[in-house]
């Protein structure tokens, strides 16, 4: 027998998650995470979580409006580090710390993906991310060149500086 109440609550939770996602600027993390998970058959939460700090860095480096919003979120979380940029970076650092605490990978390399295989799949990764509707909703929408760099930085665990 189905638990109709449980199904209803799950549906509501999924809807609320989707609505909050559309308003929270994590579209680029989803676009890149979907590409990684789709090609390398990895869990959705792991791939999106892995890309979250990289994509937030990318966004704050190119969108003043997003920087202000991310800094506001950081301050709400008690990360009052000074300027908007410092607060946003503190939030990103906290996300990385949390990933370490829960033993999640901080780079694609830590997922056990071979560098040669990664490079072989680069065109597919970029094309999937470019055509992902979640990527298109980001406050800073990357082109092919930026996505390639972002994917390569994430492979090595290098902070985004562009």
Positions of PLM-derived features:
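Carboxylate- and glycine-rich phosphate/diphosphate-binding segment that chelates Mg2+/Mn2+
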Residues: 1-24, 145
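Short coil/turn segments at secondary-structure boundaries
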Residues: 2-5, 86, 109-112, 137-145
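Alpha-helix N-cap/helix-initiation sites
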Residues: 3, 26, 45, 115-119, ...
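Residue-level detector of well-ordered alpha-helical segments, enriched
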Residues: 6-9, 28, 47-51, 69, ...
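Short alpha-helical scaffolding segments that buttress acidic/His motifs in well-ordered protein cores
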Residues: 10-18, 52, 95, 99, ...
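Glycine-rich phosphate/pyrophosphate-binding beta-alpha loops
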Residues: 15-48, 132-137
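Gly/Pro-rich interdomain helix-loop hinge
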Residues: 42-119, 160
């Amino acid at each position: 027998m189905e638990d109709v109440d449980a199904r209803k609550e799950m549906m509501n939770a999924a809807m609320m998650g989707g609505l909050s996602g559309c308003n929270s600027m994590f579209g680029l993390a989803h676009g890149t995470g979907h590409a990684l998970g789709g090609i390398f058959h990895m869990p959705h939460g792991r791939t999106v979580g892995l890309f979250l700090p990289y994509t937030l860095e990318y966004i704050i480096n190119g969108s003043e409006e997003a920087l202000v919003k991310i800094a506001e979120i950081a301050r709400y979380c008690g990360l009052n580090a000074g300027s908007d940029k410092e607060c946003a970076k503190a939030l990103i650092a906290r996300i990385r710390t949390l990933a370490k605490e829960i033993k999640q990978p901080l780079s694609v390399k830590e997922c056990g993906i071979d560098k040669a295989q990664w490079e072989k799949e680069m065109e597919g990764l970029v094309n999937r991310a470019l055509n992902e509707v979640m990527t298109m909703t980001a406050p800073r929408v990357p082109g092919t060149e930026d996505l390639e760099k972002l994917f390569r930085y994430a492979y090595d665990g290098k902070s985004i500086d562009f």
